C-alpha cells in the first residue's frame, strides 16, 4: 500500500487518540494511554521475540541443520524449524469422522439443536460480556465511580490460555493425525490473531457493539482481497455482488444510526480505524491458516499451535511492559471482573469446539446460517441491554447485510451441489 495513504490515516487519527471510555471530551491521564501508543508498544514487544526467532530459523535452514544437527535439542529444533514430513501418503490422511449408529432424522435434529444452542449460548454470552468488560466499570459505589479495565492485551492472554488448555486436552484425549507442519509457521497466524483480537476489544471503547458486529460481517470484502493477494484465488460474480450489498448495508447503518452517548467524530474515527485493523489482521489469519492446512493437520491441532504462540507473544509483551502483574492485581481487586474474564474465555474456547463439531456434522452452510442468526440476535440484545439506538434506515441497512449473507449461503450451496463433495478441514474460527 502507498506510504502516503498510511501517513494520511495516522495524521487523521492523531486528534482522536486521546478520546476513549465514557467521556470523549476528557483528556487521557497521560500520553501512554493513547491507543496508538499502546498498539505500537505491543507490536514492539512481539517483534522482540519474533524477529530474533525468524532470523534463527533462517540461519538453521541455511546451515542445513536438519542434516548436521545432533544432541538433545535436535528433535525440538526439527519440530519447530523443519517439521516432521510423513514418509508415506497414508500418514497425512486426516482421521476419519466416525458416524454414530443412531443416524435417524430425529437424532440428526437433536444434534442440530445441540450445535445451534451451543453456538448461540457461547457467542451471545461472549458478546454481552465483551461489551460489559470493555465499557463498564468495576467497584463502583455511591461515592466512587469505580475503575475501568483498559488493558485489552491482558484479556487476549486470558482467552488464549484457556483455549490452549482446551485444545491441548482435546488433542490428548482424541487421536489426531500426525503433525507435520514446522511449528514456527504458526507464529505468523498467531501474531495477526493477537493483533486482530486486541483491535476488536479496543474498538469497543470507541464504537458500539452493533457497529462492531456489522463490521465483522463486512470482513468478507478484505478476506476476498487477501485471498487474491495471498492465495491467488478467483471469485464468482455473485461473491462480488453480495460483498457489494454488504458494503451498502453497513454504510446505511453507520451513516444513519443515532449518535452514541460517548461518541464524537474523534472517537468514531478511532473506532473505525481499529475495526479496519481488526478486519485486515483477521483476514490475513484466515488465509494463512488455509495455507497451513496443506500440512493435513486437524482443526484442533491448528487451534493449539496458534494459541501456543499467542500465549508466548502476549506473556512476553506484558512482562516487558510490566502490565502482567497489574492485570492480575485488577482481578484481585474486582472479583466480578475475574468472573467475567473467566466466562469470556470459556465461551471463546468452547465456542471454537462447537464450530468444528457443527461444520463436521452439518457442513459450512448450516454453520453460516446459525452464526448469521447469532449476529442478528447479538445486535438486538446489545440494543436492549445497553441502550444503543438504531434508526429505521439503520435497521434497513442491517437487513440488507444479513440478506446478503444468506444469499451467499444459498449461492454457495447451489454451486457445491453441482460438484462432488470433497472433505476439507475448516479454518479455525476465532473470537
From Swiss-Prot:
Domain of life: Eukaryota
Membrane-protein topology: Multi-pass membrane protein
Pfam annotation, one family: UAA
Membrane-traversing stretches: 5-25, 39-59, 109-129, 153-173, 238-258, 265-285, 299-319, 353-373, 387-407
Catalytic activity entry: 3'-phosphoadenylyl sulfate(in) + adenosine 3',5'-bisphosphate(out) = 3'-phosphoadenylyl sulfate(out) + adenosine 3',5'-bisphosphate(in)
Main location: Golgi
Coiled-coil regions listed in the entry: none
Subcellular location: Golgi apparatus membrane
GO terms, biological process: 5'-adenylyl sulfate transmembrane transport; chondroitin sulfate proteoglycan biosynthetic process
Keywords: Antiport, Golgi apparatus, Membrane, Transmembrane, Transmembrane helix, Transport
One GO cellular component, as annotated: trans-Golgi network
Annotated GO MF terms: 3'-phosphoadenosine 5'-phosphosulfate transmembrane transporter activity; antiporter activity
Family affiliation: Belongs to the nucleotide-sugar transporter family. SLC35B subfamily.
Protein purpose: Probably functions as a 3'-phosphoadenylyl sulfate:adenosine 3',5'-bisphosphate antiporter at the Golgi membranes. Mediates the transport from the cytosol into the lumen of the Golgi of 3'-phosphoadenylyl sulfate/adenosine 3'-phospho 5'-phosphosulfate (PAPS), a universal sulfuryl donor for sulfation events that take place in that compartment.
Name under which the protein is recorded: Adenosine 3'-phospho 5'-phosphosulfate transporter 1
Organism: Mus musculus
